[in-house]
Amino acid sequence: PSIFRDIDYLLISHDHFDHLDKPSVAKLVAGNPRMKLFCGIGTGRLIQGWFPGLQVIEAAWYQQYADGGLRLTFLPAQHWSKRGVRDGGERLWGAFMIEADHITIYNSGDTGYAHHFRELPELFPHIDYCMIGIGAYKPRWFMKPNHISPYDALTASADMHARVTIPMHYGTFDLSDEPLFDPPHVFQSEAKKRGQDIILPELGEIIKLKRFS
């Protein structure tokens, strides 16, 4: 689709199939010849093997990449990586901080709730938007270490002092026990109880992010 044109950077959080789909990346590469890939160590090597002409920037946790007024930082997440039988942990997973045009945006990637959220304000004292997963969270005894719940997503956003929380990672793949559209309903209800500002876009909706200062 035309909305996927003129992409400058493709951010891949980790190598799991629901986050790194080769046919989807192929379409993005074909439609965006100047697009660059920013990802964790090892993931770029895998993708560049599929698309040798793609410019790849790999990063370890806390490494930054600057391009004009844009700064990307690869950050820790509580998750894991694995694509085949014997490659578990070979590629680094993580989250992103995107700083551009006086707006700071956090993207959690896949993660469980952990201490890394509380550490973010030390490095990024003014986070405007927190994009964070809310789906694939049941049953909790199994999903809790690696997939954050709608409740913990709001707690994590508060931990990092984000102004606005935007949910993601729901309503696409049937990966867990909760109904596909349970997460946004729970998230919206809980955010209202806590008095936290959220943006809950429709799937596929384009939103324009505003500056706060």
Task: Name each model-derived stretch.
Residues P1-F4, A59-P125, L203-S213:
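Core dinuclear metal-dependent hydrolase active-site scaffold
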Residues H14-H19, H79-S81, N107, H147, ...:
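Histidine-centered active-site/metal-ligand motif
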Residues I47-E58:
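Helix-loop-beta element that forms the nucleotide-linked donor phosphate-binding surface
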Residues Y9, S24, K36-F38, G42-R45, ...:
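Cap/insert and terminal regions of metallo-dependent hydrolase folds
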Residues S2-V29:
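Di-metal (Zn2+ and/or Mg2+/Mn2+) metal-binding site signature of metallo-dependent hydrolases
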Residues H16-F17, T43-G44, Q63:
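Alpha-helix capping/helix-boundary segments
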